Regions:
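Surface-exposed, low-hydrophobicity beta-strand/loop segments enriched in small/polar/acidic residues
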Residues: 1-199
Length: 199
């Protein structure tokens, strides 16, 4: 049976490892003023030279977390401006940097969609639980909604070296077919700037 999802939706917070309560609090980081390119809500990000950039450009990049929104003082109006995503390039007033809000709990669980069937059988799919995957083949987002359309790249599985570790099916009733594309999965960071490389 096909899943209802027909596209990716990035990474959506969904509890924490160990089934402990998740505060889903956000930490403040900076995006360098006038940085070109978009960074979407639900996109994995990392820190380079002190600034937030995408972590979806390399299968072995170590994310700091997932972008949830930004804040800056608009250059033309000088008004405080909150946004769902970074619509690059943004140059704030007074030569300031853009503040970004990132879910950086390395034990945060996320729901994401697969780009393909996890396996041809349910038993085969279960055998891939706790393997690691990247998301580099299917990134981007909507410049209308600002939402990421990243999916988990099922073709790049490895026991230890990829960014995201598949924990289980998210048991989303309309997107629970592991033998079809766009099933909803639960993942956790395998590579992290905070807790090591996962190897």
């Amino acid at each position: 049976m096909a899943n209802r999802n027909s596209a990716g939706f990035g990474f959506i917070p969904a509890g924490t490892l160990g089934n402990t309560p998740s505060t889903q609090g956000l930490s403040e980081y900076f995006i360098d003023a006038a940085t070109a390119g978009d960074t979407f809500n639900g996109e994995a990000v990392r820190v380079t030279a002190g600034y937030i950039v995408t972590a979806e450009d390399s299968a072995t990049a170590e994310p700091v977390g997932v972008l949830q929104g930004i804040f800056y003082n608009a250059a033309t109006t000088l008004k405080p401006t909150f946004a769902h995503w970074y619509d690059g390039a943004i140059t704030p007033a007074n030569s300031e940097d853009v503040k970004s809000f990132v879910n950086d709990n390395p034990f945060q669980l996320y729901n994401c969609a697969s780009d393909d069937a996890v396996a041809s059988t349910i038993v085969g799919a279960h055998a891939k639980y706790l393997d690691t995957f990247s998301c580099t083949a299917n990134t981007g987002g909507s410049t209308t909604t600002g939402k990421s359309n990243t999916t988990l790249d099922i073709g790049t599985t490895h026991a230890t070296t990829q960014q995201w570790r598949l924990v289980r099916s998210a048991e989303d009733p309309e997107n629970n077919d592991l033998t079809a594309a766009y099933c909803t999965l639960e993942v956790v960071q395998n590579l992290s700037e905070f807790v090591g490389t996962g190897t």
